[in-house]
Amino acid sequence: MDNNQNNFNQPGQQGFDQYQQQSGALVSYGYDANGNPVSDPSLAVYDANGMLINQNQYDQNQQQEYDQYGNPVGMLSGNVYSQENDPYYQQYNQQQNQGYEQQYDEYGNPIGLLPGSENQQNNQQQYDQYGNPIGMLPGGTNDQAYDPNQMQYDQYGNPVGMLAGVNANDQGYDYNQMQYDEYGNPVGMLPGGNANDQGYDYNQMQYDEYGNPPALYDNNQQDYYGYDQNQQYDQANNQLAVVDENYEQEQQVESNEEPAHEQDLREFLNNNSDTELVSYYEEEEDEKKPRNKKKQRQTAQARGLLPELATVNQPDQTPITPHLEAPVHYDENEELSTDDLSDDINLDQNQAVHHDAEDDVINIPIEDIESALLPKFEEIQRHNLEEIQKVKLEAAENFKVLQRANEELKSSNNELKTTNQQLKTSNEALEDSNKRIESQLQALLDSINDIKSKNNQPSQEEVDSRSKLEQRLEELAYKLDQTKEIIDETSESSRESFQQSKDQLIENFEKKIELLTEKLNQTQESFNQSQEAKQQQDKEFAQKIERIIEQTKEANDSLQNRVKESSLDMESKLENKFESFADKLTEITSKKISEKMTEQQASKKEEIDSLQSSFQKALSEVVSKVENYANQSQLQSQHLNQTLSYHQQQINNSLRQSAQMAQMAQMQHMMPQQMLMGMNNPYGFNHHTMMPPVHQYQQLPPPPPVQAPAQQLLPTINNPLQLPNENPTLFEKLMLANMFKQTINPPQPQPQALPQPHPQPQQLPPQILALPPTVVQQPNYLVPQPPRQPDYYSNRLNERMMLDDAYNAGYDEAVYELENQYYPPAYEYPEYEEIQPSFRRRGGRAKFDPYNNR
């Protein structure tokens, strides 16, 4: 099974890495329901869904292990396996032959082996966190043909350099000398001496940033493409030419063509044949007229010898004899200024034949002619060059003027475009305003129609006003249409006039540019003659351009003023119309609002009446509830008064009974202890010996009838916050008491019993002494008790009475009194308040002090 994708970063032989060299000693394996091998650890382990769980690659010496991504994570030792398949979980157990004492780190990577006897000593291999080999300790040779203990890798798994090594490899170059950049491309090599089988030396190769070879520097080596070491490349890495070292010297070809500077000189002399060059020596021989032919011959000779003037300054120039032996070249279109050409030169034989032998012929040496002609020729050439430069400068200045004019025209065009755009925007705004006016008019017409439909009998004034409004609105619409047409006509006329002026200017510029080009293309003579005329024309042209610019500026200003005036007129007209229209709208809306206000006031009056009636009902219900509550509280107070009077009568009866018992003891000379017993037990719960036994649950006789006193009812205060058929809570009572500082139901006067005559001492029945033990508590003021400190858990009666007094005195004052009674202050040092006032908050509860007692 080939697994090249597991270690794609590791170079090796034929696409295999060092963990993929399998042996033939494979064990048996099975398949699951999906056809995946499940029991052979040398292949892979899959789950029920076909996903790879674990993969162990089998090699000669040790068993490789892989993680879930296929990277090597560790190696087991041994090569003998005994498989035990689990039918449920497809797990297997391995029994390894512990041939080596392998050591692993926490990630399962081998970190060292004790000395072994195998060929490939993997006990020296080291791996990084990605499973790539990063170095090896000194070990033996391996079957990879290079020494991995010298390889170094970067964080991406690419080789970045190697230490010095001596092992040769089968790839044709030495890894020890290779250098790589950050992307893993080779960028250079150090000097090396290993020969390779690829036909060129990698040690001399250099690469650019894209990994391509830009040049080769070894002149004695050739690469495998066949071109030499002088190959050159351009910026785009394309081959320019194949150039050898001796190529330029061997491949030089002698050209018979005339040099370019000589051709230029020949053309210049041919064009200037009638100028001062030919008549240079006429100053000395003006008196001798028969020598015209000789002068013509001399000019012809000079003209034939002028191509040699370019070689005067050359050191290898051979002297030329007076007899003309050099080849004479003439242009086909050349026209000689002499009349006797046949007598002067025979061009077919390339020799100068002199027919007038009888005449005195003066043969001037060529060197003298050249020395005489050269300074004049140079002066003329300089003068012509200066004139040409002047012409070029003037043409450049004229071109700059044209460019400025074009720029001004462009700016004027842009300004006109902006004005046109502004006109367009103003037209669009006018159209939008017209649409809005139409929509508002339509809404007005709809409202008018609605008002007409509602008011079946409108008055004549309303009809007249509506008709006037309609007429005015129609007039407004008509005027708006007219303004639209006027604006469109003005914009079209301005566009047409601007386009015409623009076309005229462009035509004038084109004509003038053509004239300039024609004049610049003229010859030297015509240019010299027409130079003054050109200057005048240029001045006139500049004046015309200035006039055109001024005219364009004036036209633009006038157009802008017209547009501004038209826009201001339109705005003023529209503002006046809109103001009148707004006044009318405000009148109509004010009328509608007044009508709606009258309707709303009528509806509000009805609502206010209904609310007043409901409020009066609620007040009557509240008053009735308060009265019911007052009556109930009066009944409750009457019941409490009756119970208290009953208990008071019982206490008085017990006191009388105790007094009678004391009198009887004095009469019968009783012991002091029995007297104390009678005094300490006035109710008679402990049975005395002199009294007969009485059952403790014997019923008491009914109390005597009491006449109902005449009740004097005080005026009650109604509670306006109480709802009907609802009992007030304690919180409501306390709040009302605190607000009004008095009870809603004031205490009624208790009825006073009529004075009864003192009864005669007589023998009372024993049933009076038989009271239940839980009816009335024993009062403190009847039994002598030792004095004691006020305690929180005692005197509950006083606390309850103080809470009941909150109805009269207010809840906050009652709570303040309770806190001052039962909660002593947290400290007794008043100087702490000045030093650290936070002690007050730390001790006890917050104090309510309305009287500033502290």
Swiss-Prot record:
Q: Name one GO cellular component term.
A: plasma membrane
Q: Which residues form the signal peptide?
A: none
Q: What is its main location?
A: membrane
Q: Where is the composition biased (Pro residues)?
A: 746-764
Biased-composition ranges, Low complexity, are: 1-24
* Record membrane topology: Peripheral membrane protein
Q: Where is the composition biased (Basic and acidic residues)?
A: 258-267
The lineage's top-level taxon is Bacteria
Q: Which UniProt keywords apply?
A: Cell membrane, Coiled coil, Membrane, Repeat, Virulence
Region of interest (Disordered), ranges:
1-33, 247-327, 411-434, 743-766, 835-854
Localization of this protein: Cell membrane
Spell out the coiled coil positions from the record: 384-622
Task: Region Fibronectin-binding: list its residue ranges.
Answer: 91-109
Biased composition regions of type Polar residues, renumbered to the chain: 311-320, 411-428
Its UniProt miscellaneous note says: Absent in high passage extracts (passage 164) versus low passage (passage 14) due to a 17 bp duplication that adds a premature codon.
**What this chain does, per the record?**
Binds immobilized fibronectin, specifically the gelatin/heparin-binding domain.
Could you tell me what this protein is called?
Fibronectin-binding protein PlpA
Q: Which organism is it from?
A: Mycoplasmoides gallisepticum (strain R(low / passage 15 / clone 2))
The gene behind this protein is plpA
